[in-house]
From Swiss-Prot:
PROSITE patterns associated with the record: ARGE_DAPE_CPG2_1 (PS00758), ARGE_DAPE_CPG2_2 (PS00759)
Listed GO CC annotations: cytosol
NCBIfam families linked to this entry: peptidase-T (TIGR01882), PRK05469.1 (NF003976), PRK13381.1 (NF009920)
Binding annotation for Zn(2+) 2: 140, 174, 379
Enzymatic reactions: Release of the N-terminal residue from a tripeptide
Organism of origin: Klebsiella pneumoniae (strain 342)
Family: Belongs to the peptidase M20B family.
BP terms from Gene Ontology: peptide catabolic process; proteolysis
Alphabetical UniProt keywords: Aminopeptidase, Cytoplasm, Hydrolase, Metal-binding, Metalloprotease, Protease, Zinc
Lineage, broadest ranks: Bacteria, Pseudomonadati, Pseudomonadota, Gammaproteobacteria, Enterobacterales
Binding site for Zn(2+) 1: 78, 140, 196
Catalytic residues (UniProt): 80, 173 (proton acceptor)
Cofactor note: Binds 2 Zn(2+) ions per subunit.
UniProt name for this protein: Peptidase T
Length: 410
């Protein structure tokens, strides 16, 4: 699996951080570099129908090597890394045969500690790939890309029976835009899997319903010495708004199937302020209730303001829970589960406290659960992946292809 590690290190060396609030897709030039590289590599591997769309989606097909009416399936990963933390000049550290304890991240005081991340206790003896403490790693989702590419090479080299295998690499997943421009008809798969999960065994087909909230506040600034009855402090209004949001329903206080409100940024002055929230919930009714709650808060805080001062709230849905779409096609999950069992992996089916391209694609007619990559602690300097986990992901992808080859016409 040396080639697997080589691919991964090549992909993370490219800065593909996406950027929110940008109309163009992909949102950054760096993503194009990786997309063009993947297009060239797929062509070099001999895949057919290799394309790169104007919106930055790479697609290709590994043709079937067996006859019969075998359903075409797909595997999908995204090229962008999170805007939450720098993805520039990623300098991975390779820790072979991890023996426990803290791992120094570069030169300085940053460490990857089992005290903060107890999962490390389960990874003794494995090869860990970490950051140097200055950037994220990019295992989300370049581990998935490397695993798909390696699985394709494995299917070819070992002549393992399979039907048509479609692959796709998308941009801007981290800012919720990649799948919006995905051509499901051109992809032409019966179903697919995103390879964008976490630890070994994760098999996910439930995710958050998600929305973004933008609150713009216009106040009135005058000299503080003569401000009584005249000044309207936009920052004070912002503070009042956040005080109304349930403090016990935040990311840091919730888990499992619990939803939350998350203030992601706030900026401004006395004159103007802007707040950005994200809303998440697995239950659609609770999701809608959370959106109504934000509207009620804005209305309450804005009541009685001078006509020239106001609070403007815009809510935009990002994606929905794929569960209802995927369970209508139980074999899609069953095959992945069986593939894991066949690879001596215990499937861990739990909800995604996040989203994937697969959530949107499932609502576009392409059932698309999520498979593990072997990575942990995404979107920050403590991100890492295990080589053994990546190898397991490759095995599962290959086994899914092999099992699907036995489902003629189904």
């Amino acid at each position: 699996m040396d080639k697997l590690l080589e691919r991964f290190l090549q992909y993370v060396s490219l800065d593909t951080q996406s950027k929110p609030g940008v109309r163009q897709v992909p949102s950054t030039e760096g993503q194009w570099k990786l997309l063009r590289l993947l297009q060239a590599q797929l062509e070099e591997m001999g895949l057919v129908k290799v394309t790169l769309s104007e919106k930055g989606t790479v697609m290709g097909t590994l043709p079937a090597n067996v006859e019969g009416d075998i359903p075409a399936i797909g595997f999908i990963s995204h090229v962008d890394t999170s805007p939450d933390f720098s993805g520039k000049n990623v300098n991975p550290q390779i820790v072979e045969n991890y023996r426990g304890g803290d791992i120094a991240l570069g030169i300085g005081d940053e460490v990857l500690s089992p005290v903060m991340f107890p999962v490390l206790h389960q990874l003794l003896g494995q090869t860990l790939i970490t950051t140097d403490g200055k950037t994220l790693l990019g295992a989300d989702d370049k581990a998935g890309i490397a695993e798909i590419m390696t699985a394709l090479a494995t299917l070819q080299a070992k002549n393992i029976p399979h039907g048509d295998i479609r692959v796709a690499f998308t941009p801007d997943e981290e800012v919720g835009k990649g799948a919006k421009h995905f051509d499901v008809e051109a992809f032409d798969a019966r179903w697919a899997y995103t390879v964008d999960g976490g630890g070994v065994g994760e098999l996910e087909f439930e995710n958050f319903n998600a929305a973004s909230v933008t609150i713009k506040i216009v106040g009135n600034n005058v000299h503080p010495g003569t401000a009584k009855g005249v000044m309207v402090n936009a920052l004070s209004l912002a503070a009042r708004i956040h005080a109304e949001v349930p403090a016990d329903e935040a990311p840091e206080t919730t888990e499992g199937y619990e939803g939350f409100y998350h203030l992601t940024s706030i900026k401004g002055s006395v004159d103007r302020a802007e707040m950005h929230y994200i809303i998440r919930d697995f239950d659609r009714k609770h999701f809608e209730a959370r959106k109504r709650k934000m509207m009620e808060i804005a209305k309450k805080v804005g009541k009685g303001l001078h006509p020239d001062c106001y609070i403007e709230l815009v809510i935009e849905d990002s994606y929905y829970n794929m569960h209802e779409q995927v369970i209508a096609h139980p074999h899609v999950v069953d095959i992945a589960r069986q593939a894991m069992v066949d690879c001596d992996i215990e499937p861990q089916m739990k909800p995604i406290r996040g989203g994937t391209d697969g959530a949107q694609l499932s609502f576009m007619g392409l059932p698309c659960p999520n498979l593990f990559t072997g990575g942990y602690n995404y979107h920050g300097k403590h991100e890492f992946v295990t080589l053994e986990g990546m190898e397991k992901a490759v095995q599962v992808i290959v086994r899914i292809a092999e099992l699907t080859a036995t489902r003629k016409g189904k």
